[in-house]
Amino acid sequence: MKGMERFFRYIGILTPSDENSQNHPSSACEFNLAHELVKELQALGVSDAFVDENCYVYGHIPPTPGKEERPAIGLIAHMDTVSDFCDAAPNPQIIENYDGRDVPLGTSGRVLRVTDFPHLSQLKGRTLITTDGTTILGSDDKSGIAEIMTVVEQLDGMPHGPVSVAFTPDEEIGRGTDDFRTDVFGAKYAFTLDGEAEGEVQYESFNAAGAEVSFRGNNVHPGSAKNVMVNAALVAMEFNEMLNSAQRPEYTENYQGFVHLTDMTGSVADARLKYILRDHDRNMLAAKKAGMELAAQRLNEKYGAGTMELVIQDQYQNMAEILKDYPEVMEVARKACRSCGVSPISVPIRGATDGAILSFRGLPCPNLGTGGYAFHGPYEHLTVEGMDKMVEIVLEILRIFAE
């Protein structure tokens, strides 16, 4: 079965994770895909494939004769998607021999524009898959799942060492590795397939933290509010304006970190803001935290102690701190790309993958592309050729590790 056929089947199973849930997984619907993947793995000969109580799918492919001593290589993708634009199953548009121009997304009024996504011109002549403008596509990360499954199918008859496969829940809400069992997985090195263009070999992620800021106002009748009222919503706005506006994500790129306001609620009586803080440099992230703490201190001095409370929690670290000690893993991936006629691309991840956390748990795990682009919204798209090339690259990675 072709990777694209699998992909279309998987995106028909909705799996949005839920950041407001404390369950594991956060959404029961993730089990729907997990059970299907276990059945498919078993049908492909992965007899020990199973899904555990926390919705992690594991499977192992024994080495071919004579390759028993080669390192076990793991392949990982995540089953959940973001919850935005996920109220219905995707209705993908298939555009054969794409002309490199703007693409109207169904009747939604949205247009996939080359000016917004300049790489589109490089996809001319390929089979382009887009949304109809009303949902996500689900390429993040069901294209990765489809590619891994196709690799498993095509491994038959090819010399290879031990191969471990895992599909995780809740990656999109930062919990993809919470209950991941590296002992069950059993790999020495691994790769997540969770990137964009084919040929990506990524080993740098953000350092990350999250901040929640709560504000307590003093709500009195506005007719007698002079020198008494403290409007929590306005204090929240004041706090946000005290932060460096140049560090908002819409103004940053490459190695530039950001402070991103993700949620806000408020009234005169109380208000709440939520932020994510990101930077590839640990010291720069610390400076962003310090800027928030200083703003909080000044507002409490201005409006009275206890007017606002700031809680910052670290989330994950830059996996480059670990992967710098395993250059051979990235070099194998780059060599595989070149062998498959693709120039390897190593750009910093402006986010993270499950591999960022797993690397700090003793499982070096860089990230590979999937052939998809513009994740998390209705402009998501990918190409059949990109997916097929990623299957070829991963097979070559496994072949090289088996030498």
Task: Identify what each model region corresponds to.
Residues 233-403:
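Metal-dependent amide/peptide-bond hydrolase catalytic core
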Residues 67-162, 167, 187:
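Active-site metal-coordination/substrate-binding segment of hydrolases
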